């Protein structure tokens, strides 16, 4: 049997002796080996152009909050992260959640910016869908760094 999953599921299975890791996307080396990029844009702020145009202050506030969280993660310990999330996140096992955070932190962006290699890797990952694979996508137009760059100046 095999699974493709995220933490804390992987840490729980490995920690319980019920699984071993063949390919690990929780590390930069693993991300590069699997996806061809050190980071993969996944947990990002998704919004439409019309929302941004109508709500630039709200958009900036949301990006500022995410940017501040990324900066906090530079010095936070996994235990600090556990202390900030709802108990339901770690389902009664804060130690395994802390292990999951420790394993995943290296792949988190520290700048909030999406790299060109990350854009390409995301497109390749989603190209299993024939509709996406055949689409003409201007990757440079899918990620707007303007608000992240402004957050970095605050």
Stretches found by the model and what they are:
Residues 1-86:
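Pocket-lining segment of extracytoplasmic ligand-binding domains
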Residues 120-154:
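Conserved C-terminal helix/tail region of periplasmic/extracytoplasmic solute-binding proteins
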Residues 17-18, 113, 153:
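Intrinsically disordered, low-complexity regions
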Residues 52-132:
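Secondary-structure end/capping motifs
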Residues 32-35, 109-110, 145-152:
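Short, solvent-exposed polar/charged micro-motifs at secondary-structure junctions
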Residues 48, 115, 144-148:
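Residue-level signal for threonine
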Residues 1, 18, 95, 130-139:
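A local structural motif
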């Amino acid at each position: 049997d095999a699974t493709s999953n995220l933490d804390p599921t992987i840490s729980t299975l490995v920690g319980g002796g019920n699984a071993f890791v063949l390919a690990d996307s929780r590390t930069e080396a693993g991300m590069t080996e699997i996806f061809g990029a050190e980071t993969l844009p996944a947990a990002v702020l998704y919004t439409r152009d019309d929302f941004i145009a109508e709500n630039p202050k709200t958009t900036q506030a949301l990006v500022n909050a995410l940017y501040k969280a990324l900066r906090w993660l530079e010095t936070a310990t996994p235990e600090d992260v556990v202390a900030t999330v709802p108990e339901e996140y770690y389902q009664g096992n804060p130690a395994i959640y802390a292990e999951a955070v420790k394993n995943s932190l290296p792949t988190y962006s520290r700048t909030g910016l999406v790299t060109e290699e990350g854009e390409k890797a995301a497109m390749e990952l989603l190209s299993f869908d024939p509709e996406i694979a055949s689409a003409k996508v201007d990757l440079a137009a899918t990620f707007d760094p303007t608000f992240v760059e402004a957050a970095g100046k605050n």
